[in-house]
Amino acid sequence: MRYNYNDGSLKIDLDEELDMKACKTLRTVIDGYIMRYQPREFIIDLSDVKFMDSSGIGLLIGRYNLIKFMDSKMIVLNPTHSIK
């Protein structure tokens, strides 16, 4: 995972697998970035994600709900064919 914050926009680049084990850690880390930066725009790039189970979907929905509560917007970029 990589992240970048610039001018109100927080971008998270996720990689490899979004399974239960990975999501447990990612949830804490990503929420920390969201609370720290309070972005107006939150971008998650999935271009390097090869596998996503229901935990990954839950991760995305949970971050969406948090961002929506903050009156910000969330953008999901580049979902690969295998996870669409």
Model-derived features: positions:
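STAS-typified acidic loop motif
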Residues: M1-T28
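Amphipathic alpha-helical interaction surfaces in cytosolic regulatory modules
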Residues: M20-K84
